[in-house]
Every structure is written in structure tokens, then in C-alpha cells.
């Protein structure tokens, strides 16, 4: 089983850079500083809109062009012509996430707040005065991270797999007799939140509403704020219920923590946990299945065993990572990153997909399959995804794929992979809109979808 890199162990070793190209820190290593590259505002360059179809249709080419024109750090503009930086270099992302003092998660220091309207579509992703773990720094952040990790560590992986198998069978029973279905809409998008609802203590019937709210929120469009409100209200209600009647679930364990967190703080952290877990896990399932159904290296072994599932999942975290770009850090003072002058208060985004494609570490794409876990898909540094959360996501995704292949052994893509598949319109998350498949109709196993 492929396991995510242990954040408490030694740092992962990146693939060897190409010796024919200078490393990102070599420019200006001796002699005078050559100054920022042409894309920096110091040269009057304009920002690249973080939107458009190319983030869905050809992200590899897009990031290559951005790197060619601007280097490891590119100026971008967000909705409303709000300036920011996108870090595309592998080592620069590592540097950014390794210094929580210079590059802080305290969004209060942002120098653009006076330009942000209250109904800004990206508001749910860039919070101001939100008491969640995302924007907490220092010792308080470490205490909150410990609270979350301690609660998630109590999730029994054997029981988690059992719940995932049961819910997977129920969902597959809903379409297995039809001979064709959309794996995204009827399986991948429904399964993770069912499991999360179970381990967090939600009633099963609330899962569909959570799916809709999460999709609205993370796509960052006109319904983003409504999705955020629904999710926040759901978590506040859940915390109140568990405060009154504790159960055997993650929420009750968080409330039992002795570090003195308020119910509102716990509710805010639950929003972060569910939003960070559901959609990326659903996309991990969908993207891995797409790879297995379209790539001969994996398609040939669909019915021949499970050995390729872990390889496909690992490769997806390099090639089609569910989180493309992430709202990242704010510079606490003037500094330089990748040769660009970053002003105090500037917003700096983590270009996770761009860093994965960095030619300084990607001399041969085939070298990144197998057991290389040095990707940034789970983040890095103090604000990385907690290791227990990584394990939970992997158990859910791998079990979902294995159960589907067991139940539908001759599953095949029902459309042309070049023309029949489209990606969701989001520069943040990479996932398919649909994954139409066909298979030999099979009987139900007794589940109720």
C-alpha cells in the first residue's frame, strides 16, 4: 500500500535535478543581484489571470509557459483584478512552506483588504478574522493541529475500511444493473462525504446537502458564499449536538480536548477538515480511475489484480493532483523569492501542480511513478495536512477504487478520452465533471443506496 510521506519523519528526497540546467537558487549566487525576472512588477509586468479553460484543458503546457515567461514565481491576478503571486518552483514552494514567520498564514497582514468586496467569490477561501486553524499561527496553531491530529488518530483504519466498503457497495448497487453510469456524479462525489459524515458524527441524511455546499464553496463562483454558510451552519449545529450528547466520533473527541477551544473554534476547524477532505478525495478517486481506464499500463491489469491501484493513485498525485493551487501565505515583510521582490502583505499562492511539473526535478516523468512521495499534494511544513488525515483520505480512495473494480471487473470508458471528458472549471481543484463508463450489468449485493 502506498502511504503518504510521514511529516514527522525525514524530509522526502526530490528527484535529482537536471545538471544541464541551473538550480533555482543559483542565479545571482555570486556577483551582483541581477534583479527580478521580466515578469515581476518591478519591470512593469502584468499579472496572469488565475482563470480560464487552460487550467482544465492543458495545465502542463500552461505552467510551462508561465515558468518560461516569469520564472519560478509568477505574478497573477485573482477575481476582481486582485494581485498575487503563484509559486511554480519546487524548491521555492519548499522554501515558502518551511518559514511560517516570513510567510505567515495570518491573513490580517494582506495589503489588499481595502479592495475586497464582501461578496467576493473567493471570500470563503481567504478568510479574514476567521477563527479556524487555517489562519492561526504560532503556539495556538500547534495546539489546534495537535487537537485535530489526536482526534483523527482515534479513527480505526480497519473500521474505516469497513464503512467505506459498505457505503461503496450501497452506491454501486444503485447502478450496477444498468450497464453504464457516471462514476463522478454517482460514486466518487458521494462516497467520501458519506464516510466523513459517519466518522464526524453527522446523520447519514445530511450528506447530500454537504456535498452540494462543498462543491459550491470550493469552485469559488456565485454560490460560494451560500455554500460556506450552509457548511458553517451544519458544523455549528453538529457541535451543539455533540456538546449536549457526546458520541464515539471525531467531533466529540475534539470537544473533549482540554486546550480550551471554544465551540465556535471547533466548528470552524470542522469546516476546514471536511472541505479539505471531501472534494480532493473525490477527485483523487476520479482522477485515478480515469488514469486506469485510459492508460494501457494500468488498463491491462484492471481485472488482473490490485497491484496497480496504489501506483495509479501515486502517479495522480504528481500528474493530476486534486489540489492544483492553494491559497497560501502572506509575506510578513519585504523579501525575495525566486528572484522576485515580494512586498510586505503580498499574497503568495502555492502552485502545487506547477511545482510537481518543475523541470528542475522532472527530467523524466516515468521516474515519478512508483513509490516517490515527494509531491506537495498534502502540503508541507507547519500547515501541512495532518498525517492521520492523509491516511484517512488514502484508505477511502483506495478502498473506493478496489471495491468498484471488484464489483465491475470489465468496467471501461464509455467515451473518447480525448473528446468526451471535461474538467471542472476551477483553477484550485482538478477533477472531472463526469467519467462515463460501461460494464456488464451485475446483480446488487443487498445494499440500499
How does the language model describe each region?
Residues 2-449:
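Cytochrome P450
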